[in-house]
Amino acid sequence: MARLAGVDLPREKRMEIALTYIYGIGRTRSKEILRATDISFDVRPKDLDDDQLAKLREALENYRLEGDLRREVQADIRRKIEIGCYQGLRHRRHLPVHGQRTKTNARTRKGPKKTVAGKKKAGKK
């Protein structure tokens, strides 16, 4: 099993896809890394030899990945909250940050609906 950046890559997937299992690497960056290391997109992680794995590890050192990237993102969010900018306020209130509508939708960010009782009808006497 190939292990890169602390992540076990799936053995049967194409290398182009397998690299995307690492947090911080998407399809574009995966292709970029494979081109730089002269490794085929179609090779499977189980078929990589030690030289190719060493090249990949060396190439991955140039990027912030996994825990470092997660910490950096969290630090950026904390900084925005502390300085009190608009994005920080939206994070603090658990609302969408990038200008999306909130009258309807935004349920992922806001959580489940909080049901509010309607006005009761007056009974006849």
Swiss-Prot record:
Stored PROSITE patterns: RIBOSOMAL_S13_1 (PS00646), RIBOSOMAL_S13_2 (PS50159)
InterPro entries: Rbsml_uS13_C, Ribosomal_uS13, Ribosomal_uS13-like_H2TH, Ribosomal_uS13_bac-type, Ribosomal_uS13_CS
Name of the protein in question: Small ribosomal subunit protein uS13
GO molecular function: rRNA binding; structural constituent of ribosome; tRNA binding
GO CC annotation, single: small ribosomal subunit
Protein encoded by which gene: rpsM
Subunit structure: Part of the 30S ribosomal subunit. Forms a loose heterodimer with protein S19. Forms two bridges to the 50S subunit in the 70S ribosome.
Alphabetical keyword list: Ribonucleoprotein, Ribosomal protein, RNA-binding, rRNA-binding, tRNA-binding
Disulfide bonds listed in the record: none
Entry function: Located at the top of the head of the 30S subunit, it contacts several helices of the 16S rRNA. In the 70S ribosome it contacts the 23S rRNA (bridge B1a) and protein L5 of the 50S subunit (bridge B1b), connecting the 2 subunits; these bridges are implicated in subunit movement. Contacts the tRNAs in the A and P-sites.
